[in-house]
């Protein structure tokens, strides 16, 4: 019951705190192309996460489940939207359903709505191999997300305080999983060192979950009597974290999330090196405040605008968009310089 109440609290406070939009994309500027040699009608947006083919570089990221009828209804609506647009979708952490079978329906609903969709299961880094297998089977998942949320847990009044052995648990899950494993942050970004460690244990993809979207430190602080306000501005911005990711020069796929709301955000994230982008809080707000049809329309506009931007840049495919020239400025440039990451190749390609 406590876990279910927390799920509902997270929805309420995530909507009330909003998104910070401190993602750093304002420091990224495309180099204008006066002769793009492109046509809107021939632009294609297919992409891949590992060997998993996606029809769009936009997917619906993990939000909820395990909070009774309300979370069931949210996942039902999100699954409908995913089916309508042929988008991949992740569910929120399934630990609630593993501990209380009555909550499983709030996750299983997605397969009832969209039997042939691409879905990601989701568990925290405390999960065992057996729990990971059950979570995947619960929703017939095509991949498994393992989320890292140290700052959220520390800020959460009833959260975890012991984070030893996490990498080893992830490695065991990777070795035993029948589906690709994606490791994701929840709004605090990832450093290149963390991503190199994750690559070393064989994960397929990393969702950098950068600072700039829903602030789960702020969400949990709303639930505390004594606020840990020093965590409210903690983390690595989304744009910076994507560049840290690509600087590792490994074969992982990268997912950009954290405050992404516009087609320009999507285009910049992909141009920095992401394979796809994920929306959560922004889509949830539209769904809860304006309804399902408004969300369907918004995703239509996102795809239209992304194709306009790709046409302007002369990028006919997502792969070509990953190679267009851009300039990195401001705080993002200074951070990367201090971290020893060369940015000149972005502007000269």
Curated annotation (Swiss-Prot):
Its main location: cytoplasm. Its cofactor is FMN; NADPH; Mg(2+). Homooctamer. Dimer of tetramers. Mg(2+) binds at residue 153. GO terms for biological process: isoprenoid biosynthetic process. The gene is fni. Involved in the biosynthesis of isoprenoids. Catalyzes the 1,3-allylic rearrangement of the homoallylic substrate isopentenyl (IPP) to its allylic isomer, dimethylallyl diphosphate (DMAPP). InterPro entries: Aldolase_TIM, FMN-dep_DH, IPdP_isomerase. FMN binds at residues 62-64, 93, 122, 184, 214, 258-259, 280-281. NCBIfam families: IPP_isom_2. Keywords: Cytoplasm, Flavoprotein, FMN, Isomerase, Isoprene biosynthesis, Magnesium, Metal-binding, NADP. This is Isopentenyl-diphosphate delta-isomerase. Belongs to the IPP isomerase type 2 family. It catalyses: isopentenyl diphosphate = dimethylallyl diphosphate.
């Amino acid at each position: 019951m406590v876990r279910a109440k927390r799920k509902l609290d997270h929805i309420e406070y995530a909507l009330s705190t909003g998104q910070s939009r401190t993602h750093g994309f304002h420091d990224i500027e495309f180099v204008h192309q006066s002769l793009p040699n492109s046509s809107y009608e021939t632009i294609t947006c297919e992409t891949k996460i590992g060997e998993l083919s996606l029809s769009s570089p936009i997917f619906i990221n993990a939000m909820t489940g395990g909070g009774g009828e309300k979370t069931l209804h949210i996942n039902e609506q999100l699954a409908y939207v995913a089916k309508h647009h042929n988008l991949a979708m992740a569910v929120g952490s399934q630990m609630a359903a593993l501990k209380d079978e009555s909550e499983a329906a709030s996750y299983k609903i997605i397969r009832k709505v969209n039997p042939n969709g691409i879905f990601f299961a989701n568990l925290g880094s405390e999960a065992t191999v057996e729990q990971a297998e059950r979570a995947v089977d619960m929703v017939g998942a095509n991949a498994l997300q393992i989320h890292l949320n140290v700052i959220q847990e520390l800020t959460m009044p009833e959260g975890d305080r012991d984070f030893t052995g996490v990498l080893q648990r992830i490695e065991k899950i990777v070795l035993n999983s029948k589906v690709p494993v994606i490791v994701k942050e929840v709004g605090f970004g990832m450093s290149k060192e963390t991503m190199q460690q994750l690559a070393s244990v064989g994960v397929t993809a990393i969702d950098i979950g950068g600072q700039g979207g829903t602030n789960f430190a702020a969400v949990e602080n709303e639930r505390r009597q004594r606020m840990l306000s020093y965590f409210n501005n903690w983390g690595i911005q989304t744009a910076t974290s994507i560049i840290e990711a690509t600087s590792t020069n490994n074969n992982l796929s990268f997912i950009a999330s954290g405050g992404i709301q516009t087609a320009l955000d999507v285009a910049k994230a992909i141009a920095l090196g992401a394979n796809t982008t994920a929306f959560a809080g922004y889509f949830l707000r539209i769904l809860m405040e304006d309804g399902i049809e408004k969300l369907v329309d918004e995703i239509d506009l996102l795809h239209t605008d992304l194709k306009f931007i790709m046409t302007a840049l002369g990028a006919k495919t997502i792969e070509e968009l990953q190679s267009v020239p851009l300039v990195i400025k401001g705080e993002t440039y200074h951070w990367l310089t201090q971290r020893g990451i060369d940015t000149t190749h972005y502007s000269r390609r």
